[in-house]
Amino acid sequence: MEKKKVVLAYSGGLDTSVAIKWLQEKNYDIIALCLDLGEGKDLAFVKEKALSVGAIKSYMIDVQEEFANEYALMAMQAHTLYEGKYPLVSALSRPLIAKKLVEIAEQEGATAVAHGCTGKGNDQVRFEVSIQALNPYLEVIAPVREWKWSREEEIAYAKENNVPIPINLDSPFSIDQNLWGRSNECGILEDPWAAPPEDAYEMTLALEDTPNKPEFVEIGFEAGVPTTLNGTAYPLSELIKTLNALAGKHGVGRIDHVENRLVGIKSREVYECPAAMTLITAHKELEDLTLVKEVAHFKPMIEQKITELIYNGLWFSPLKQALNAFLQETQKNVTGTVRVKLFKGHAIVEGRKSEYSLYDEKLATYTAQDEFNHDAAVGFISLFGLPTKVYSQVNQKKVEA
């Protein structure tokens, strides 16, 4: 029987390494796909490991700039904080991974794609909904969800089939990382009362270890896109990396969150997002300076919906594309510079300026230079309060009667 081809999203860990052997037993030729999302792994080693385990071909693709410009940027502009806290670190990368899986599958003539997600997480939904949106004819295989092995059973299978056991297998944590941040769950973190141990963190320093002197950074934006740090221009992926190091050194971006998962359970996760939280904070302040009130007040409703769509795996949905069109329209004048103080876990905006600033000091001042027409306030108040006044008059008459 001729073997079918499957493209596997490969991380180099135990689950996806075992999946190669498991898929071989199901009569598949496996093509491994590993993406460089800025997590800092030795991906050349991961690429070769896939071949040594049994893949017939192995791809390693650097998608850092694509991830930064087409995914993280939108999240920043939409101030996406799921349940007010989580900047969608993992949720943002899943549609890009799904997109590349589909592209390689079509290029290689594969009939299926596979991922290493379990049956109780959000990522299985994000991957499979995205894949269906991009190519509804591809079969999607989820080996870990199908085999339902315990960790001990999986290790035993790996040993029987000469699959290398990762040296960090004893780590209690499940970690996912990319340019936009780092997520950490499992182990002691499953107890919502337990304080996260310091070894749960990698990108940020504990407050006790951060500098006792603040550091200032000026972030330049052009049409909503961060382009400079302290006057130096960077590609967006490099700007994010640089800011991760700067803000992380000051303990910015630590998040401890009990979140409501898409699949109906609550999960406690620890996130580190120094650049994401700094950029979202700075960008919001620049919008406050440059957007008219009606747009500034309406945009958070769109942001909330965009956040939910991304979290729920609906990146490629028609609604998300439509809302993105609104989002891009709001960014045309979000150009300027924001000065941020990084200190003891905080990213504090201390100054902002823009050629499109709608702040008029002559109208806002209380000094002798005040140009605001105070006399106009009388008529404005009369008209603005008229519906409330009429309502009160009518109802007071009924009470008196």
Swiss-Prot record:
SUPFAM superfamilies found in the cross-reference section: Adenine nucleotide alpha hydrolases-like, Argininosuccinate synthetase, C-terminal domain
Binding site for ATP: A9, Y10, S11, G12, G13, L14, D15, T16, S17, G116
EC number(s) on file: 6.3.4.5
Catalytic reaction equation(s): L-citrulline + L-aspartate + ATP = 2-(N(omega)-L-arginino)succinate + AMP + diphosphate + H(+)
PROSITE patterns per the UniProt record, alphabetical: ARGININOSUCCIN_SYN_1, ARGININOSUCCIN_SYN_2
InterPro entries the record matches: Arginosuc_syn_C, Arginosuc_syn_N, Arginosuc_synth, Arginosuc_synth_CS, Arginosuc_synth_type_1_subfam, AS_cat/multimer_dom_body, Rossmann-like_a/b/a_fold
Keywords assigned by UniProt, alphabetized: Amino-acid biosynthesis, Arginine biosynthesis, ATP-binding, Cytoplasm, Ligase, Nucleotide-binding
Family affiliation: Belongs to the argininosuccinate synthase family. Type 1 subfamily.
Subunit-level organization: Homotetramer.
Protein name (database record): Argininosuccinate synthase
Gene source species: Bacillus thuringiensis (strain Al Hakam)
